[in-house]
From Swiss-Prot:
Listed name of the protein: Myoglobin
Keywords: Cytoplasm, Heme, Iron, Metal-binding, Muscle protein, Oxidoreductase, Oxygen transport, Transport
Binding positions (nitrite): H60
Function description: Monomeric heme protein which primary function is to store oxygen and facilitate its diffusion within muscle tissues. Reversibly binds oxygen through a pentacoordinated heme iron and enables its timely and efficient release as needed during periods of heightened demand. Depending on the oxidative conditions of tissues and cells, and in addition to its ability to bind oxygen, it also has a nitrite reductase activity whereby it regulates the production of bioactive nitric oxide.
GO biological process: removal of superoxide radicals
Catalytic activity entry: Fe(III)-heme b-[protein] + nitric oxide + H2O = Fe(II)-heme b-[protein] + nitrite + 2 H(+); H2O2 + AH2 = A + 2 H2O
Gene3D superfamilies per record: 6.10.140.2100, 6.10.140.2110
Entry superkingdom: Eukaryota
Taxonomy of the source species: Eukaryota, Metazoa, Chordata, Craniata, Vertebrata
List of residues binding heme b: H89
Length: 147
């Protein structure tokens, strides 16, 4: 619970502008891990230099951060929120679990730069994301999705 609370203390700036922060997260994910762009076919025709200003990238990034905010606010009691997310990402989108680990690190960097998440907060975010991703992985296994 303490880790969730520590991350939530810095969540305000993110929550105040999901679209801008979401765009930063996805653009950085695609820059640092170009292979992840292949997992988003709807962004395939967008030139790399245009990703940051693309409304679709911004909207999807906002969706990611809104869902993460809901999971954070559940403070560990997130099973009902996570199940449908796990299901769609395993069965429809076919997103390997490793990609959640990659985006979690990017979210941490963006939160450090834009929301003041300090070193202890970074550790708390890693702990929180490890819990969420482990639970997603268990959902994936139940669904028979293995990378």
């Amino acid at each position: 619970m303490a880790d969730f609370d520590m991350v939530l203390k810095c969540w305000g700036p993110v929550e105040a502008d999901h679209a801008t922060h979401g765009s930063l997260v996805l653009t950085r994910l695609f820059t640092e891990h170009p292979e992840t762009l292949k997992l988003f076919p709807k962004f395939a025709g967008i030139a790399h230099g245009d990703l940051a200003g693309d409304a679709g990238v911004s909207a999807h990034g906002a969706t990611v951060l809104k869902k993460l905010g809901d999971l954070l606010k559940a403070r560990g009691g997130h099973a009902a929120l996570l199940k449908p997310l796990s299901s769609s990402h395993a069965t429809k989108h076919k997103i390997p679990i490793i990609n959640f680990k990659l985006i979690a690190e990017v979210i941490g960097k963006v939160m450090e730069e834009k929301a003041g998440l300090d070193a202890a907060g970074q550790t708390a975010l890693r702990n929180v994301m490890a819990i969420i991703i482990t639970d997603m992985e268990a959902d994936y296994k139940e669904l028979g999705f293995t990378e």
